[in-house]
A protein has these predicted regions:
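Short, acidic/polar
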Residues: 13-25, 90, 172-182, 246-260
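N-terminal beta1-alpha1-beta2 module of alpha/beta enzyme domains
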Residues: 1-66, 168, 273, 278, ...
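Hydrophobic faces of well-ordered beta-strands that scaffold small-molecule active sites
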Residues: 3-7, 33-35, 72-74, 102-106, ...
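Active-site beta-loop-alpha junctions enriched in small/polar residues
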Residues: 8-10, 38-40, 77-79, 107-111, ...
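Acidic (Asp/Glu)-rich catalytic clusters
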Residues: 26-27, 60-68, 91, 95-101, ...
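Active-site mouth loops of central-metabolism enzymes
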Residues: 4-15, 75-85, 165-175, 237-251
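Internal, glycine-rich beta/alpha segment that forms the wall or movable "lid"
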Residues: 43-47, 83-186, 205-206, 213, ...
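An alpha-helical appendage that flanks or caps ligand/catalytic pockets
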Residues: 31, 123-159, 163, 193-295
């Protein structure tokens, strides 16, 4: 099992800080770095939700040019917000910049107020997500390619450059069973958030059962969990966060991370919940020097 990081999206962490954190993560042996996606944060959400969201494709391009081996990924691109043909072009170009290190996690989105600001139908987001995944794969893998859908159709078009990877991985975000179904039906992996190891074990049993029903081979299917982390001097019981979060004293956090190892998942991606860059670097060094060698 590997450890990855999500780029911090908290106040006081700017894009240059994010770049430095990604470079440090690679130096310390972390295997992946992920960029989140929101375009606007409506006023009613400000204060309850971070509004520091650089464009994921631009920040990942910068990271790709300052690192050599760490995997990079979107987590998760909200597909209905963008023209999927343009997303396909951005991803394929980025895959060249990073020499084939890209994974594209996608999701249908959840913040209705953001859909409203962008003048995009909230109700149609699931159907669009499914169709847009098909558009991405059609453009990346076939040439010339034809596609006929409810939202996009094209005939005999050429799309270049193709990604470096012959099969650029598309993972599905989301915690609900419907998200699991979409990941099995249309994607190459599943990336939920915030589950404890016991909760994730239950979800994985459902995933395997559904995959068996659909006769989906899971040999090349990846599972990656995102969870919040902060190492403090206080017990996790006093953190004020849900008990599923990786928050508390160092030994408590380490034990929680190690508990996922029995599930045979690809990685745990760490979401830092402190706005202090130095604390984030200190935590990276602690994990890189003490926990990653054990994994």
């Amino acid at each position: 099992m590997d450890l990855g990081i999500a780029l911090p999206i908290l106040a006081n962490i700017d894009v240059k800080d994010q770049l430095q954190i990604a470079i440090k993560a690679e130096e310390l042996g972390f295997k992946s770095v992920w960029a989140s996606d929101h375009i606007v944060i409506p006023k009613e959400w400000k204060g309850r939700f971070s509004d520091i969201f650089p464009d994921p494709f631009i920040i990942l391009t910068a990271i790709s040019q300052n690192t050599k081996k760490i995997k990079i990924g979107t987590s998760a691109i909200i597909l209905p917000y963008r023209n999927p043909i343009i997303v396909a072009k951005m991803c394929s170009t980025l895959d060249h910049f990073c020499d084939g290190r890209l994974t594209c996690t996608v999701a249908p989105g959840w913040m209705k107020e953001e859909f409203d600001v962008l003048n995009i139908s909230y109700d149609g987001r699931i159907d669009k997500t499914v169709e847009y995944i098909k558009v991405l794969k059609s453009l990346w893998e076939d040439d010339p390619t034809d596609f006929k859908g409810n939202f996009y159709s094209f005939n005999d078009v050429s799309f270049q450059p193709k990604p470096i990877q012959k099969h650029l991985p598309v993972w599905m975000g989301g915690n609900h069973e419907k998200a699991i179904q979409r990941s099995i039906d249309y994607a190459d992996g599943w990336q939920p958030i915030w589950f404890s190891s016991d909760e994730l074990e239950i979800k994985m049993k459902y995933l395997k059962q559904y995959a068996e029903e659909k006769e989906r081979n899971l040999d090349n299917f990846s599972i990656s969990l995102r969870n919040r982390i902060r190492i403090t001097q206080k017990s996790d019981k006093n953190s004020g966060h849900p008990p599923t979060a990786l928050i508390g004293k160092k030994n408590e956090v380490y034990d929680k991370i190690l508990s996922y190892r029995r599930l045979d998942i690809k990685e745990v991606v760490l979401d830092f919940i402190t706005p202090d860059k130095e604390e984030i670097i200190e935590t990276l060094e602690m994990l890189g020097n003490e926990l990653i060698p054990e994994l």
